[in-house]
């Protein structure tokens, strides 16, 4: 669920999802359109795509099992949906960590009105 995703982001990046990622670029936070602005925004775009494939799952509310060992996030056993949601979140949190060196403050509270044009396909 979203709280677990927030904790994963915090474990990986040492930053809270709010405010650092909740309104970042065109894809971090709710929805999205246009082109991802940078590597961080691309992580969020890919996360949206990952969730988009899980149409039969409650991606924002289903609880799943995960742990952190030796600095790596590990998804635990659960229902198919729980495991898939966890993997989407784990991959995104890891992606956000890898993108920390290109994080731009100017995209932190980016206005949706700047996200124009066609969206990429997943």
Curated annotation (Swiss-Prot):
Record: residues binding Ca(2+): 27, 29, 31, 48
One Pfam family recorded for the sequence: Phospholip_A2_1
Cofactor: Ca(2+)
UniProt cross-references to SUPFAM superfamilies, sorted A to Z: Phospholipase A2, PLA2 (SSF48619)
Cellular component terms (Gene Ontology): extracellular region
Cofactor note: Binds 1 Ca(2+) ion.
Presence of keyword Metal-binding: yes
Classification via CDD domains: PLA2c
Disulfide bonds: 26-115, 28-44, 43-95, 49-122, 50-88, 57-81, 75-86
First-tier enzyme category under EC: hydrolase
Domain of life, source organism: Eukaryota
Predominant location category: secreted
Reactions that this protein is recorded to catalyse: a 1,2-diacyl-sn-glycero-3-phosphocholine + H2O = a 1-acyl-sn-glycero-3-phosphocholine + a fatty acid + H(+)
GO biological process: one example: lipid catabolic process
Keywords from the UniProt entry: Calcium, Disulfide bond, Hydrolase, Metal-binding, Secreted, Toxin
EC number: 3.1.1.4
Tissue: Expressed by the venom gland.
Compartment annotation: Secreted
Active-site residue numbers: 47, 89
Molecular functions per Gene Ontology: calcium ion binding; calcium-dependent phospholipase A2 activity; phospholipid binding; toxin activity
Role, per record: Heterodimer A-B: Nigroviriditoxin possesses phospholipase A2 (PLA2) activity. It consists of a non-covalent association of a basic PLA2 subunit B with a non-enzymatic subunit A.
Subunit and interaction comment: Nigroviriditoxin is a heterodimer of an acidic subunit A and a basic subunit B.
Family per similarity comment: Belongs to the phospholipase A2 family. Group II subfamily. D49 sub-subfamily.
Protein name, per record: Phospholipase A2 nigroviriditoxin basic subunit B
Species in which this protein is naturally found: Bothriechis nigroviridis (Black-speckled palm pit viper)
């Amino acid at each position: 669920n979203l709280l677990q995703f927030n904790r994963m982001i915090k474990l990986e990046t040492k930053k809270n999802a709010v405010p650092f990622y909740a309104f970042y670029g065109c894809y971090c936070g709710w929805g999205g359109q246009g082109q991802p602005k940078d590597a961080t925004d691309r992580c969020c775009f890919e996360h949206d795509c990952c969730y988009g494939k899980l149409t039969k799952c409650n991606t924002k509310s289903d609880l799943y099992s995960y742990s952190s060992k030796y600095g790596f996030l590990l998804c635990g056993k659960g229902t198919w949906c729980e495991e898939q949601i966890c993997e989407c979140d784990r991959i995104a949190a890891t992606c956000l960590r890898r993108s920390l060196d290109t994080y731009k403050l100017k995209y932190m509270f980016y206005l949706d009105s700047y996200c124009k044009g066609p969206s990429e396909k997943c």
